[in-house]
Amino acid sequence: MTEAATEMPSPINFTESACAKVQDLIAEEGNPDLKLRVFVTGGGCSGFQYGFTFDEIANEDDTAIERQGVTFLVDPMSYQYLVGAEIDYQESLEGSQFVIRNPNATTTCGCGSSFSV
């Protein structure tokens, strides 16, 4: 597993809002070993889509990024598509969701969860 240093800038930026929401979700589950896995899969209307899931175990080839007491995991295939991205958590009248601003995406779907490169 590759560790990104806590104080150094990360190739993937997790905002304070995203970290706070993940902390809240982990507290609700009552399992401090949970880590948020951020991944990219084929599919969606633009070719790729983002996904989020909790995981207790980091795979050997995962990149682990620690921010504000939260560990985010990214697998090698997803990492290449997420370098330079910012992951935020937004609350609005339309609902609450994690939002990824990805400079590598050439097009995105209206829902914001699908993209192409």
Swiss-Prot record:
The keyword Iron applies. One of its GO terms (molecular function) is iron ion binding. It comes from the Bacteria. It holds the Pfam family Fe-S_biosyn. Its cofactor is iron-sulfur cluster. Binds 1 iron-sulfur cluster per subunit. Keywords: Iron, Iron-sulfur, Metal-binding. One of its GO terms (biological process) is iron-sulfur cluster assembly. SUPFAM superfamilies: HesB-like domain. Iron-sulfur cluster binds at C45, C109, C111. Gene3D superfamilies: HesB-like domain. The keyword Iron-sulfur applies. Belongs to the HesB/IscA family. Homodimer. HAMAP family: Fe_S_insert_ErpA. Required for insertion of 4Fe-4S clusters. This is Putative iron-sulfur cluster insertion protein ErpA. It comes from Chromobacterium violaceum (strain ATCC 12472 / DSM 30191 / JCM 1249 / CCUG 213 / NBRC 12614 / NCIMB 9131 / NCTC 9757 / MK). The gene is erpA.
